[in-house]
């Protein structure tokens, strides 16, 4: 399995080898297979998974058609995950957190906390200008944003003030401390993106951990 959908519950700490280890508790599953995407029909191979049951009255008719066909109740978080093959999977099949039992490290994708419109000092860590000595009303400004008549524009990627957070973020190589199959919980060492109760995509780590 290439991954599983989950929800961030919060952070706590456990005692391991004589040391406190900060961990994030993630509710991972059960997921349900809603659709199977094939190379012949869709041009790619993937599974559409659903997680976190919700009320039918809050579900659109197109989505209800998908849920009814799979024989599952409406799910709040629906996402496609690429797999090598859809063979062995059936519509409505339940996928639990134990698929990650043998996985030591994971990559987790979530939506970071939104912080609204922020200036360059908060958003990018600029040091700002001096408090006095020639500085007038420019203490927290970003300074020059480009050249003059050539190129006559602000270059792409220039760090400026604007929306801060509320973006898709992936954190790689997070250690799986414990898999609680009975309660569908994952204990992940360290922090993961997003606020409490935000949704996550958990996949086996792509990169190898050295050492």
From Swiss-Prot:
Might you report a single GO cellular component term? cytosolic large ribosomal subunit
Alphabetized Pfam families for the sequence: Ribosomal_L3
Protein purpose: One of the primary rRNA binding proteins, it binds directly near the 3'-end of the 23S rRNA, where it nucleates assembly of the 50S subunit.
Q: Please list where the region (Disordered) is annotated.
A: 116-142
NCBIfam families attached here?
L3_bact
| Assembly and oligomerization | Part of the 50S ribosomal subunit. Forms a cluster with proteins L14 and L19.
Q: Which UniProt keywords apply?
A: Ribonucleoprotein, Ribosomal protein, RNA-binding, rRNA-binding
| SUPFAM superfamilies in alphabetical order | Translation proteins
Instruction: Provide the protein name.
Output: Large ribosomal subunit protein uL3
| Gene it is expressed from | rplC
